[in-house]
């Protein structure tokens, strides 16, 4: 099985709290595979209002269905591990990795989507 980087980039948060999520990569991606998501969260900081982010992965059960949350994580303040890694997820019908900053100071996050094919 080959391992590859499916997509990567840098996401700059708006002024927290952000009203909506921002997709990392292509929203509604229909590429089949086993994926892991990596986000550099080393910029998260503690403070009077600690930085906080919400991460979601959405997927459809059927290709004609509605994308719904299949995995969700909340990170608050400085993290012991500077890179957040999702579990491996089998995705295929229309999936999205998305993030929003809910509190603190607007931060920049590098991210990578890794695929096993």
What residue ranges belong to the model's regions?
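Solvent-exposed serine/threonine-rich low-complexity stretches and specific carbohydrate-binding patches
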Residues: 9, 68-78
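Noncatalytic modules at the cell exterior or secretory-pathway interfaces
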Residues: 32-39, 88-109
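Exposed aromatic-hydrophobic patches
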Residues: 22-26, 80-89
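Tryptophan-centered short beta-strand motifs
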Residues: 11, 16, 21, 64-69
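C-terminal interaction-tip segments
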Residues: 1-16, 33, 101-117
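Short amphipathic, basic-aromatic surface patches that mediate peripheral association
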Residues: 38-47
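Surface-exposed loop/edge segments in extracytoplasmic proteins
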Residues: 2-4, 63-72
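Short, surface-exposed beta-strand/strand-loop-strand elements in extracellular ectodomains
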Residues: 48-63
């Amino acid at each position: 099985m080959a391992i590859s980087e499916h997509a990567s980039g840098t996401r700059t948060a708006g002024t927290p709290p952000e009203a909506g999520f921002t997709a990392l990569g292509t929203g509604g991606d229909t590429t089949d595979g086993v994926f892991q998501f990596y986000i550099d969260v080393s910029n998260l900081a503690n403070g009077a209002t600690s930085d906080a982010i919400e991460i979601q992965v959405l997927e459809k059960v059927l290709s004609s269905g509605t994308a719904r949350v299949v995995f969700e994580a909340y990170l608050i303040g400085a993290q012991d591990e500077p890179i957040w890694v999702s579990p491996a997820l089998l995705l295929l019908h229309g999936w999205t990795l998305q993030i929003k900053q809910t509190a603190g100071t607007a931060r920049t996050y590098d991210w990578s989507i890794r695929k096993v094919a």
